Amino acid sequence: MMIKEEAEGILKQRNSKLEELLHLAADPLLTDISSHKSRVSEFLNDNDITKEKTFVVSSLPGVSGSGSFAEAMSQSVSKSIYKVEEAKERTENAAIEQGLKRRTESISDDRKLKISRKSSSQLSDSRSGSISKSTSEITKPVAPPVKSQKENIHLETKDFLNRDIGELEILSVPEHYPTKPPNVSSLAELYYLTQTLPLIKLLPGSHKTLITENYELALLEGKIAVLYSRIEELKRQGKWSLRQPKRYYDPYIYTKSNNGKKTFHGDSLLEEGKWMAADFKEGSKYKKACCVTMAQAVNDYWTYGKVMCIRRKRIWHIGERREEEEIHGDLETDLVDGADSMAIDDINVDNDCAPLEITGNELQNIVVSDDKVSTEPISNDEPQRKEEDDIDSAEVADQEVSEDPSQDKPVDELIPEEEVELSSIDVKLLLSRPKPEDEIVPTNLPTFSEDDLKEMGRDSKDSAPFKLHANLNDLKKIDQSIIKNLPKFTAFDNEDSNMPAPALKPVDSPMIAVSRLLHPFEEDDEWYKIVLKEGDSHKSKSNVSSGPPEYQKGLFGFQSHRRFNYLKPPKPPLIKNIEFRSPTIWLPQDDKHLIHYVAEFCFNWDLISEHLSPSAATLRKYESNIERRTPWQCFERYIQLNEKFQFSDMKGIYSYQAQSWLEHAHRAQSTTKRRISPLGVGNESIQRGHRRLRWASLFDAMRKSMKKREDAIAKLNHRRTPVDYSANNTNVNSPEASNNGTPGPNNGKRPMDRVPTPAELSKLKFERDKSIQEAYLNQQATRSRMIAAVAQQQKQQQNNQGNIPRPPSQGPGPNVGVPPPQRGQIGVQGGPTNTPTGSLGNQVPPSQQPSQAAQGGMTKRPTTPNGTAYTAEQIQQLLQIQKQRRLMQQQNQPGKTGISPSQPNTPALMQNMPLSSNKTTVGGSNMPLSGMPNSTQQVSLSQQGQKQQLGPSQRQQVPVSQPSQGQGSSTGVPANKSRIHFAPAQVSAIINSIQTKNPNLTKEQVTKLAATYLANIQQQQQNRANQQQQQPPSQHSGAIGQGPAAHRPGQSQSPSNQKKPQVATLTPQERNQLQMLKAAKTAQQQQLQHQQQQQQQQQQQQQQQQQRRPGSPMVPNAPLDPNNMAKLEYEQRKNLLIQKHQQQQRLGNNSNIPGQSTPNLASMPPSSSSSPSSSVSGPASNLPNSNKNVPKK
């Protein structure tokens, strides 16, 4: 029982081993074991040991009877591996049929499959009875075969050579041409790689040997990243040009930094110049050496004879018979150097022996014949004499003519030169033609042989002092090869085959290097290589089967820049011009080019437009509307051709504008009969003989230009606003307007309409400076004339008034002959005589200030010493500080009040003024007064006495009236009548007004009329002063204390004459200033009332002080003089008008005067010296057109 069980166990083990052998033989890689179960039982039955059947190896699948089991296993393994490729091909074919378009097929794979099929067929034939066919079909391959690189190259080469020659393209290309083009990647791809996987980060962690090139490549990637980012930045800014010009290298800098690696045109010129200089220098040396050699040859010929001549071989012509002896003799003559000269003469070789050098006789003949030398080949067939070797060819011709017997003369007739006396010269002999053989007797040549020369140490072959030729053997081998390879020219060769290429072609530039004239060292034209290239059919198959399809090639596949670009419209034109557009005509070839360029340049419309334009943009020529190809017109035509276009396809910054433009164009086309959109026509639709309707577009362009001019004129006439009209009307009678003939500074055109060119600005500045200079000269002339006329009238009036004492004056000037009150008025009204007219805002009489405000407009606001403008709060604080200071001055000095004109302005006070007053600002202008005459300094100093009270020095207002001597008035003012003195600006304004109204009058007549008018004004003022003197003093004092309601007959209130400010047009800052000024006025009124209450007490205290000072010119207990009262009223009115004038300047009712200076805060009027509603009285208020005729600068 135990034995039976052991036998069954052994049998089972045997069967399991046999089953394993079966699986290994059928499927060595054991891919699918379950498929072989049906064959196991059959195999075990065939090898059942119970039936006395022994195991046979050949029964295994794949094992033949003659082979071993190991060979069968190796064949089975290779078979299963090749089946992998076969299965892969099957799956790829199935994928292509399903639409995936994936197929990889190569020649090597086909050969492998053929081999596997052969082996499988052999295996199936060997064991057809034992193993079924399903076993080989069920096996599934797993891995490709593992082969070395050498084996793969060998298989590919063998497959390439076994391919049919019809599938290949045979190319013959020069040897130095590259066979395969280099791989090129786009900048975007390189930038992406540098940002994702930069080499500079991968190199430190690499596990291979690194060399310098790896790090240089990493640095190059960094440079590419910087370059790409910079290009993208320039593209966003619109600064990246479509065409990149060649970089310019400065010759000096580039050569200095790069050691002359790059040559320029200038360098080529220098090199050619150096070469030519060397060539000329060596050429002159060569000529000198030739001359020396020739002279030496002549000397040797006459010294040693014919032995120094070169032997020449006789020339045998066609038809002549040459005997062998003569030929042999000639050869001996040429080859043997030691031939005898007499033998040479016997064979008539001496006729052939002629020296190559120029003999002495020939030199004489050359001189005689005026350097006319002609060389002729010497022929041996003509008999010649021995002397002909020394005769010039021209003389030989003359000798042949003279051999005529009729012209020959006997030799006896010739008289020797020795017998001819100087006193008797035969003219016939001079006129007769001489014979050289008679006159020139050649000397006998010496006869030397070669042996004689050798004995003397001379050689006939090497007699030249210099070497004038180059021997080929003396050169180097490279130079010899160059000379030997130079092309040779023969007369009867084929020109096309043997003639070398021309050194210079007509299309080449004239500057050619010297080496260009030589034959090239490397003859590339002779060496070509044969390149076998795959045909188009195989290339299409390989493209289909190489890798995934186009849409699966990743981010940087083939033409990836075209796949991921979206439609970016250019900037559209203005929508308002849609109705006036003319359509563009597009021919079929234009559409074809447009589609091609759109695909080529990826919706870069500017570049597409450049390529579609008929000519370059730099060529200025007329281009009709229908021929233009702007970026927008190209885009419009493209979307017209694209039937699938939608607004959602547009991306970019102009997408919204382009969509709105297209919508407006569609609506305009539906309402307009004329076509607006582009028109595509065929070649047959274009009219004949018109150049694309260019004539029609010419008329259209002319019509548009005419319409544009008419529209411009209409806009110019209707664009003027009421503010411009008012400004122009204000400036109509200005001096500049009257001189230039223009309606005003605006000329009916706003500044924002047109920007003047630099030439126009320069012209305007020149005209303005010229008009200012003329106006200044006219003012000076008029002022001098008016001062003389006024001085003359004053003298006449003083004579009529009687004995009126005149106080001493500070110096000569325009105040000479004018009483002290009038000097004070001049100091208040006139100001410095040399100040510009634009700075007279605070020196002009009150009635003239509104007119200047109308002309000058709003001045600049008060500024700090640094030039910055004060704010409204700072101005209010300064006004309060000034108010407090004036109150303190009135309390500390009760005898000197701000409104009392009775305080004298003594010369001592004028002298004690600071020296810096010579350069103080007058009316806001920084004009130094140091260079002015004494009269001008007095006037400016008298006015500055008024302005000192507003500064931070807390100075009291100093009246400008001069003290009188010997008068009984308590105020120190004489009892004469008050007079008025006009400023130069007022006089010039009056003259300009008269000249404008009467242009036909001359300057003298205008001056006389102005003088008469001023005299009338002064007379009226005097009459008013006389009426005021007759009134009792109580009325004057009452007039002073009337306050805001004061008004007298014959006077006009200034607020009624002034223009009310337009509050609606004020800025918030100006409104704050206006409120501040109103508050200051209220404070002034309150302060004025307080001052009027204290006036009586102040007068009493002043009288007491005058009594204590006996030397004082003031007389105590004297009532107020009427003149002083009138002056006090005048000061009040003046200060009020100054304040009003500054208010109007801040409100900005009028235009600015060019050149007017900024008033300082110190030039503001005193806030406590006037009433806002006080009346105005002055002779200047009656001037004609006084509000328009103040000249401006």
UniProtKB/Swiss-Prot annotation:
Bias (Basic and acidic residues): 99-113
Known role: Component of the NuA4 histone acetyltransferase complex which is involved in transcriptional activation of selected genes principally by acetylation of nucleosomal histone H4 and H2A. The NuA4 complex is also involved in DNA repair.
Keyword DNA damage: yes
Biased composition (Polar residues): 726-745, 831-844, 899-934, 1064-1075, 1140-1161, 1182-1193
Myb-like domain segment(s): 586-642
Chain segments carrying region Disordered: 92-147, 368-414, 716-756, 787-867, 885-976, 1020-1193
Subunit structure: Component of the NuA4 histone acetyltransferase complex.
GO BP annotation list: chromatin organization; DNA repair
Biased amino acid composition, Pro residues: 805-822
Name of the protein in question: Chromatin modification-related protein EAF1
GO molecular function annotations of the record: chromatin binding
Compositionally biased residues, Acidic residues: 389-405
Record's keyword annotation contains Hydrolase: no
Family membership noted in the UniProt record: Belongs to the EAF1 family.
Keywords: Activator, Chromatin regulator, DNA damage, DNA repair, Nucleus, Transcription, Transcription regulation
Recorded GO CC terms: NuA4 histone acetyltransferase complex; nucleus
Major location category of this protein: nucleus
Gene3D superfamilies: Homeodomain-like (1.10.10.60)
Compositional bias segments (type: Low complexity): 118-132, 792-803, 845-855, 935-974, 1020-1035, 1051-1062, 1084-1107, 1163-1181
Domain HSA: 253-332
